[in-house]
Regions:
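Structural microenvironment flanking redox-active thiols in thiol-disulfide oxidoreductases
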Residues: 72-116, 124-132
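Thiol/disulfide oxidoreductase modules built on the thioredoxin-like
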Residues: 57, 114-118, 124-169
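Non-globular targeting/processing and membrane-anchoring segments
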Residues: 1-49, 54, 162-280
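Short active-site neighborhood of thiol/selenol oxidoreductases, capturing the structured segment around
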Residues: 48-72, 78, 92
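Proline-centered helix-kink/hinge sites
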Residues: 35, 70, 76-80, 87, ...
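Sec-exported extracytoplasmic/periplasmic mature domains
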Residues: 83-87, 114, 150, 169-176
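The substrate-binding groove and active-site-proximal loops of carbohydrate-active enzymes
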Residues: 66-67, 96-98, 153
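Compact recognition or signaling/catalytic modules
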Residues: 2-3, 7, 42, 50, ...
Length: 280
């Protein structure tokens, strides 16, 4: 899951790095320095941080959006790494760059950070200033910087959680059992069927997935296959969840006061006896 891109171009150094098939990027032999955080940006849950003051510790920077399901699904791992390794020197920083008008509102970002109980610092990058400095390509994106402030590794999309944690441990000089998979579909090496692509607005029609989500703003009810779901805050909301990847039909209708910006689908583990998905 997540974007697959032929290369990433760092605009500060013009260094091209090769994207691996897994979505991971190998750092090039020449050092790529961590871009600074523009000082005028608002940090929603801590006093402003400066990247140059993080030297001597590894820093994990994650681009995310509370209205994108792929971003939400990485949060348990980021929170766990913060709790596990902050005392050893790791700094986890969330860069919130909204894809929708509602997720570019700084107050909405702050409310989402509180609601999601995010324990690590988050900066609101609503004008894509940090995004552009990084030459970032999608959500979520995970940049690991070493103690010198040089790029150590980069991953686009979900997954590779164990690999990232082992890299963190290597930089810190510690060795522990990694955070276990937070969902069955996160099991290392598991091949997942392809899910239906994201659809604009309130989608009604056939789909194949393990779950269906909707990006919603406003307050009100959305009908999901005739079932009323009350929405009280903006974000990406889970509407349908299956124990395994399956085909289904979705009927959505947003009521007064509610706007549906996108319908999203996530993969599920194959059902017992189902043919194995082809390798990527």
């Amino acid at each position: 899951m997540g974007g697959a891109y032929p290369h990433v171009l760092n605009p500060r150094r013009g260094a091209k790095v090769a994207l691996l098939a897994s979505g991971r990027v190998r750092a090039p032999p020449q050092a790529i320095p961590a871009p600074p955080f523009p000082r005028e940006l608002r940090w929603v849950n801590v006093a402003p941080l400066r990247m140059d003051q993080q030297r001597g510790r590894p820093v994990l920077v994650e681009f995310w959006d509370f209205c994108r399901v792929n971003s939400l699904r990485t949060l348990p791992y980021l929170s766990a790494w913060h709790e596990r390794y902050a005392a050893d020197g790791l700094r986890v920083i969330g860069v919130h760059t909204g894809a929708f008008a509602v997720s570019r509102d700084v107050d909405a970002i702050g409310a989402a950070v509180e609601r999601l109980e995010i324990p690590y610092p988050v900066v609101a990058d609503s004008e894509l200033q940090i995004w552009d400095l990084y030459g970032n390509k999608g959500w979520p994106a995970r940049y690991l910087w070493d103690q010198r402030g040089a790029l150590y590794s980069l991953h686009y999309g979900e997954g590779a959680y164990e690999e990232t944690e082992r890299e963190i441990q290597g930089l810190l000089g510690v060795e522990r059992d990694p955070v276990p998979p937070q969902r069955p579909e996160d099991t290392p090496g598991l091949l997942l069927p392809a899910q239906t692509e994201d659809q604009p607005g309130a989608y009604s029609g056939p789909y194949e997935a393990g779950g269906a989500w909707a990006v919603l703003s406003g307050r009100g009810e959305i009908l999901v296959n005739g079932r009323a779901v009350e929405i009280a805050e903006p974000g990406c909301h889970l509407l349908v969840e299956h124990p395994h990847h399956r085909a289904g039909v979705l009927e959505l209708s947003a009521g007064p006061g509610l706007e549906c910006h996108m319908t999203c689908f996530t993969p599920g583990v194959p059902a017992p006896g189902a043919p194995a998905p082809p390798a990527a």
